[in-house]
Amino acid sequence: MEIMVEKNDLDFFVNKRIFITGHTGFKGSWLTYLLDRNKAIIKGYSLSPISKPSLFSNLKFSDQFTSVISDINDFEKLRNEIVNFKPDIIFHLAAQPIVLESYENPKNTFDTNFRGTLNLLEI
């Protein structure tokens, strides 16, 4: 198996303040875990995991990690969390990714995937 990332590349994230939206999803959980293991200071912002048990709830995180369970469409809460945390880096992974759900609830999908991103960019 080919090594995709050298350890020295991950040293960049040591003690960086990182804000991750969608940290309870599949990709967000792994990103949070990887950065946490590399001593980043992380605040995650996401809805509760949709599956039980979830990958997110099965992973173990350090005391450097804080999880906020909230909706990316709540502009004031999102703004307050980002402003108070003062991140060096923001990873935006929050989304409504389920295609069938997008057909059944297109407004929610639009709000989350478009307006949620717009909320983040407005801050």
Regions found by a protein language model. Name each.
Residues M1-I123:
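N-terminal Rossmann-like NAD(P)+-binding domain of SDR-like oxidoreductases, especially those catalyzing
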